[in-house]
Design a protein with these regions (language model features):
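Signature of N-terminal electron-transfer/Fe-S-associated modules in redox systems
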Residues: 1-156
Length: 156
């Protein structure tokens, strides 16, 4: 089973997940709060309750992939892969939302924090895990100043 290492600040937690598990579901099951709002109230209240609950529309579950991007579901599916995904949903073999890649790309496109970091940012609700990876939850970004366009992350 794949191992996912979640990093939040100085905290690190490693969990084993079945292959194909949606990253957001794995984090929630492990007790990791992935939804983030820039202005938080009392222990993550806004992030916990005011989000799209895994449909890929709000962008609050954005994560930074620091290792293992090749083991995550792709951002783009071929027509055949999309058709197979739809058939599997109809048969109850796959969960809707596991690979809504157009929605993921659109949501990340709207977010300032992903500008210049497109290769590292993913929405945890839109990513299926197929191998070991390291994920930074609620990554901090310099959204102003002279270092805005720097790319210090390993996937670039």
């Amino acid at each position: 089973m794949p191992k996912v290492v979640f990093i939040r600040g100085k905290d690190k937690q490693e969990v084993e997940v079945p292959e194909g598990t949606v990253l957001r579901d794995a984090a929630i099951k492990a007790g990791i709060q992935v939804n983030y709002f820039p202005v938080e109230l009392g222990n993550g209240f806004l992030g916990r309750y005011l989000n799209c609950h895994g449909f890929g529309h709000c962008g609050t579950c954005k994560v930074l992939v620091t290792k293992g991007m090749e083991y995550l579901s792709p951002k783009k599916l071929s027509a055949e892969e999309w058709q197979k995904h739809r058939e599997n949903i109809d048969k109850g073999l796959e969960k809707p939302g596991a690979q809504r890649t157009f929605t993921e790309k659109l949501t990340l496109w709207r977010m300032f924090s992903s500008i210049g970091h497109e290769g590292e940012m993913r929405l945890s609700c839109q990513v299926a895990v197929h191998g070991d990876c390291t994920i930074e939850v609620n990554p901090s970004f310099n959204l102003d100043g002279e270092n805005f366009w720097q790319k210090p992350y390993p996937n670039k």
